[in-house]
Amino acid sequence: MSEGATYTFDQSDSSNAGHPLRFSTTSNGTHGGGSEYTTGVTTNGTPGSAGAYTRITVAVGTPTLYYYCSIHSGMGGQANTP
């Protein structure tokens, strides 16, 4: 992901039900002892429902981020941030 860019992750497909996408500076997010990263992040709706999305605007100086499912441990990875 590039600094200054905005990314929208469409979570409206039924396969996303029960898998809210979140970001953290810690691998595996809150499951790995970290906290949710919320700077520039907007969520809308319920994953698996029409109109659901997670949006992030990557600010200058954003640290390395990890994406994860806030419900299930082990569902995520590193997002390539500057």
Specify the residue positions occupied by each region the protein language model found.
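GGW-centered surface loops in extracellular recognition modules
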Residues: 1-5, 81
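Short edge beta-strand/loop segments characteristic of extracellular beta-sandwich folds
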Residues: 8-12
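Acidic Ser/Thr/Pro-rich low-complexity disordered segments
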Residues: 26-40
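Extracellular/periplasmic metallocenter environments
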Residues: 15-18, 39-82
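Short, surface-exposed beta-strand/strand-loop-strand elements in extracellular ectodomains
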Residues: 18-30, 81
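Low-complexity, compositionally biased segments
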Residues: 13, 31-34, 47
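A generic structural micro-environment signature
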Residues: 7, 27-29, 62-64
